[in-house]
């Protein structure tokens, strides 16, 4: 089953959280739709969300653990470990998690990544109430 490793970066480009999921859209909706387990200050600090796609959940778990120990993100409890990676995994390209596909002209309205995530979270919550 396809899985993802994702990371939150702050305005300075620092990795502040690393996680993994099998459904990136649902997970972002949970994080930013009020069901996230992280401190609110983490979500307020997010300036960029990046992800990598893996063929298996086991691969994503290995990379998640590797990146947490490599970057020691502020909001990962595992990142507080004193151990550092002793293996070197292949670095993959991080893709930016976003919804906008076209450049928006100045003055035009646009829907950004986090707005879209909140909309997904709202729709998901409505379906949960109906079901």
What residues fall within each predicted segment?
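Structure-specific nucleic-acid interaction/processing domains
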Residues: 1-18, 22-102
């Amino acid at each position: 089953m396809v899985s993802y490793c994702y990371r939150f970066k702050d305005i300075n480009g620092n990795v502040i959280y690393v996680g993994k999921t099998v459904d990136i859209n649902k997970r972002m909706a949970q994080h930013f739709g009020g069901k996230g387990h992280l401190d609110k200050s983490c979500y307020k600090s997010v300036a960029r969300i990046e992800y990598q796609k893996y063929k298996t959940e086991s691969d994503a778990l290995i990379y998640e653990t590797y990146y947490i120990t490599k970057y020691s993100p502020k909001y990962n409890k595992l990142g507080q470990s004193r151990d550092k990676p002793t293996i070197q995994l292949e670095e993959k390209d991080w893709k930016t998690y976003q919804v906008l596909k076209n450049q928006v002209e100045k003055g035009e309205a646009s829907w950004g990544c986090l707005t879209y995530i909140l909309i997904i979270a709202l729709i998901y919550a409505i379906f949960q109430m109906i079901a």
